[in-house]
Amino acid sequence: MTATLPQLDSSWWDQAELRPVLASRDVAGIFGWLQRHGWSQTQIGARTCQSQGEVSEILNGRQVKAYDVLERIADAFEIPRGRMGLAYSSSSQREGDKSSELTSDDRRNFAGAVASVAFGSVNDQARKWLPELANSVASVPAVITDSDVEQVASMTLEFRKLDQRYGGGAAVDAARGFYGYARRMIHSTADERTHRDLKVSLADFSSMLGWSFHDIGDQAAARRFLMNALVLAKDADEPSLAASILYRLGRVSMQEAQPVEALKMLQLGQLAAQDAGDPAEVARLHANEALAYAMLGKHDHVLDALARAEHEMGRADKSRVSPWTTLYFTPGDYTGHQALVYNSLSGYAKDETQAREYAVRAVEFAQQAITESGPDRSRRSRTFDRIVLSTNLLRTNELDAGVDVARDVINEAQVLRSGRGLSRLAEIGAAASHHSGSSDAVDLLHQLESVRTTAPKALTA
């Protein structure tokens, strides 16, 4: 019969007498508190993957300074990492998230931290960018098996479907809660293969969760969960997944109008994808380099990156594409991406004639993507195609068609719980503003303003 563990109450860590203990990382004080509440040295050690002797040494004055050990102790006893200065606490993180704008120093520090993790070193700077994980009431199994790993993979699939069909806002809260539970399984007993598979599944889940935060407009939380995913993927030695995460970090940078920073993330991703021998992921990274170059107005670089993407797509075995890359090979998705690239070229072009030529190409690709798309393609992606189509019809002076598509897609975007979808409607508004002599265009602008002012703030950040 398995012995019942003593009480563990996560509300302990909110008590005033424990705050200085946690803030000073006084592990002896933490262990002493646990002992006073019925925990033996052996039980503490089993929870933190330490021997009874190591626990005894700590209680007798040995200091714990290693970040990974401190993190393990915090997670094992459900101590919010922020209380121990291991990551921002939920309150301080919310304060920092009021603006998604980072200082130039923040951006340099984050880029350096990502590069450090990408090359296999999780240093103190990287740990500062990890998320505060939600506490979970449910206990995790003491010993995990393949079925526990399959549960995480299955939940990843289900939340990913919700995210793609209804937007990140439909998935993010429940997904964050489940991850707070599932992440604790990393301290459970398992054989080496199962432990590695769990890390891969947790990394994929955290990447999906980061993408959902990205979609609702919370780039700060997206950055933290993607960093968390990258740490796990590197620890599990899964370079294809690491490449996918770096692609997503690149898209976060682009969402914040930082294409040069995005290129750095994507180039790190290329190293991981090539290490994995994964042409599918290499292709997606090249395609997104094209989008970053479009934001910089570098047409020749765009064409080169798209050509490289198509070459790698031709090499990829579509029957063996990783689950985190599958969507990219859905019919219509790459064509929709090309539409987005030409939409950006048009938006950033300084020459009006050239901007119109790019807009014509964007219309062609958007229409083609809509035609190619089947039920397997993300509903959100199809909505984005229509936003690109409407924007560029208006840019090419096809006013009636542009307004008609816009009215339909505004309704679609309002149904989606996607901050990206709502923010992209602004491009329709910018294009419509050039037709101020048209009553239809003016009505469209009023409709867009109404959507902007009534949308939930969490989705318009």
What are these regions (language model features)?
Residues T4-L5, A16, S136, V140-A461:
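Conserved binding/catalytic microenvironments
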Residues R62-D75:
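Short, basic-rich loop-to-helix N-cap that marks the start of a DNA-contacting helix
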Residues C49-K65:
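Recognition helix of helix-turn-helix/homeodomain-like DNA-binding domains
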Residues M1-W39, E71, G82, Q93:
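A short, Lys/Arg-rich alpha-helix, primarily the initiator
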Residues Q43-A46:
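Short alpha-helical "recognition helix" segments of helix-turn-helix
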Residues Q41, Q52, L70:
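Helix-turn-helix DNA-binding elements, focusing on the entry/boundary residues of the two helices
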Residues G85-E150:
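Compositionally biased, long intrinsically disordered regions
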